[in-house]
Amino acid sequence: MAMRCFLICFPFSFLLFACNNRGNIPDVSGIKVNLEVQRFENDFFSIDTNTVSRGLQSLYQKYPSFTPVFFGGVLGLPDSAAIIQNEARRFISLNRPIYQEAERRYKDVGKIKSKLQENFQFVKYYFPSYSIPTIITLVGPIDGMAKMENGDYSTDFLGRDFLGISLQFYLGKDFSVYHAQYFVDNVAPQYRSRRFEKEYIPADAMKLIVDDLFPDRSTGKPLIEQMIEKGKQWWLLDKFMPGSADSLKTGFTQKQLAWCNANEGLVWHYFVTSENLETIEPSVIQNYIGESPTTQGMPDSSPGNIGQWVGWQIVKKFAGENPSLKPEEIMTAAPRKILTESKYKPK
């Protein structure tokens, strides 16, 4: 399809999609969630580098499940007391400026805690047996992200009984390190680091909860199935964050969301006529799913990851056609069933 067939400019339409109609949002005010937030970075960077061994002992006592993950998984150190002591001393010295910036921006995390607590109320509403993790903030390497089971990279990570929030990736889009050439080339290009803002923390955290409940194992499947499986993830995320802006959940800008909504029919026609929906070729799939500034073959106004957005619309249509289905039933429904029964034919 020629690029000129897409509508490029809708100057007022973004206003229509900032707060979508969520239908009936359940009342979760009576659901008790005792969310605990622990500040690992404060204890870690308070260690006296002259007596690191004593400080590490206190860390292991206070954070018994998190500390081994921090040193082994986050810092990538072997299980050697001597190496951990030396590298901890070195890390504290080299990264103190990053910690100080995080401390300045996140001295009080009360608002973030309140938002997460509200999100977890919705989690408990839909999945009462889900165990709420302790939130642990940290400052880790500025050049390392956590690799998730589905192959994506996340700023945060989920452990057995904790959810780690890496504050070094939420220091504001204008933070100087994010604009250094090494960081842009090797860690996060600016179309991603523009989201390294405080308001994205709850959505990033809830994405981990969604993936914990229903891991995305669609890799290797045809494009249309991956689109729908990933669309399910955003559909459930929307259930956990019904009052939050779609821009925070998708990572799209408001203008990109407006473009998607204005061109939904053309985008779907593009997929159908391109004959790519059944492809399993990774290089083709990568063009439509995953992080990128825009979608190749579509106007610059389009966002990257357009495939997940289309999958989300299909799942929403399927859920609307089947209002009696519970979230678990929708999340476990076969992609082909969802596609067929959604009767998805946007104009």
Task: Report the location of each language-model feature.
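Positively charged n-region of N-terminal signal peptides that target proteins for export
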Residues: 1-6
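C-terminal motif of bacterial Sec signal peptides marking the signal peptidase cleavage site
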Residues: 15-18
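N-terminal mature-domain "stem" immediately C-terminal to a signal peptide or N-terminal signal-anchor/transmembrane
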Residues: 20-89, 93-94
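Sec-exported extracytoplasmic/periplasmic mature domains
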Residues: 45, 75, 121-128, 237-245, ...
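Acidic/His-rich structured neighborhood in mature extracellular/periplasmic domains
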Residues: 87-257, 332-335
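Acidic/His/Gly-enriched intrinsically disordered linker/tail segments
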Residues: 227-294
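C-terminal soluble interaction/assembly domains
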Residues: 272, 278-347
